[in-house]
């Protein structure tokens, strides 16, 4: 999730667990702790390989096999210094642990991919029921923290924190229900296209859980469809798009290609632009605009030569037209008739 959400989520969790007399300090401590796993972006920024930067983010710093040791080290250091942690060590231990573990857990509900069990050799988890920025998910945590800060040690603060946590969890539950409804609507259309067993995923479009995008892979590319839980009631419509699967097969053993396909579960589009092979991550964006596009190889005669390092191509999202179209599509526009 975005950094602002993590600030308030962490603050609410820690403040709800520690003694009331520590509440304001806990709000600040939780905000700092829940930001900690994302600090991996700073050392990764020193790397000139964009695929390394992408695929190592949400790795070791987001691992449930690593974070308990980090939590213990932080807790032990502060307990040794006295102060609030030494006054209530048990509560602070559970608060620190819960805060750090919650960060990668909520990240796993986005489509980016979180290596929750690093260093085990398994692809990143992407439950993809939440967009990385969702104001309605952020709001309960924000309001809970504001009320708790103002109410301090009063019972109102604890009630606000518990209400905020409950609403936040309920929103995640709703997102999973919405995802299941979309996938149920998509299934008959995919079966009709002969794609019953094709690799596929669904993901909410920006800032909401009412409008969704579904992608399924085909032998020569992929199909893509949208579903509004408000406006759409008929059969789901998919549009076919090509991918240069022959070129992708030719470079499939290149280390950068192996890494990025492992990371995105092979949900990738390949296209040749001016003799350069570009891989686009189908999970983030929509046809033809994707957030992550990597130039991985150049063609010399009949052979492909790896680019070292790969290049990340710029992505520009036209926010105002995009938001207007998104809002309209949620409420009004049914899928076009083929």
Regions found by a protein language model. Give the residues of each.
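ATP/pyrophosphate-binding catalytic subdomain of soluble kinases
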Residues: 204-207, 211
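Extracytosolic and intramembrane catalytic regions of membrane-associated proteins
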Residues: 196-199, 211-338
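N-terminal membrane-targeting hydrophobic helices
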Residues: 1-204
